């Protein structure tokens, strides 16, 4: 949507993966100093998985679990497949060392072009008019993977820019029950109204 605003009629994104890299499921990927993917400067582990108000798994535990299961198919590897430059071996370069959590500053810098919040902020003069009425995002306030946190940062940026983006937080909903209560039907109706505006009942 952000890359091709003239082509798409809108986006209705639910529980979007980190849209602001200042909170990439924990670490801030926008800082210049050497950073760690597993813990903050004080050594406190970044939590990742929560359910019922309880933190169940840290980011380090999650990454190590994926490593045991295999390189391909995991969430962290999928981020690298999309965002990372290609290494000498032809594979996506890892953002962080799986043993220590140390972030590779070269890869971190390469990821910045996918930081949606920053892309919007720095290109708003051009993108703003093209995205008017097109941005709709939904997330639970208790998202299982803390995805509400980067979305709140994006919401703040959108307000500063005067955007009409509709960012909605569903109280108490997690990553897995977000659609309860008719959200699917609501999104479908809104999409249909854009795609088929002349059809009766579309709005």
Spans of model-derived segments:
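Non-catalytic cap/lid and distal C-terminal segments of serine-dependent acyl enzymes
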Residues: 1-203
């Amino acid at each position: 949507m952000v890359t091709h605003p003239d082509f798409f009629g809108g986006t209705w994104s639910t529980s979007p993966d980190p849209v602001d890299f200042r909170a990439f499921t924990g670490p801030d990927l926008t800082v210049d100093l050497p950073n760690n993917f597993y813990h903050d400067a004080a050594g406190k582990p970044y939590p990742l998985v929560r359910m019922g108000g309880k933190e169940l798994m840290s980011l380090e535990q999650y990454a190590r679990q994926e490593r045991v299961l295999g390189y391909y198919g995991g969430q962290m590897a999928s981020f690298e497949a999309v965002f990372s430059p290609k290494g000498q071996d032809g594979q996506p370069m890892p953002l962080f060392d799986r043993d220590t959590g140390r972030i590779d500053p070269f890869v971190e810098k390469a990821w910045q072009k996918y930081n949606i919040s920053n892309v919007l902020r720095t290109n708003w003069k051009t993108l703003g008019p093209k995205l008017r009425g097109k941005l709709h995002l939904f997330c639970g306030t208790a998202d299982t993977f803390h995805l509400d946190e980067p979305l709140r940062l994006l919401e703040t940026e959108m307000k500063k820019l005067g955007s009409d983006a509709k960012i909605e937080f569903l109280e108490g909903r997690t990553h897995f029950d977000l659609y309860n209560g008719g959200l699917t039907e609501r999104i479908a109706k809104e999409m249909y109204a854009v795609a088929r505006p002349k059809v009766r009942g579309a709005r």
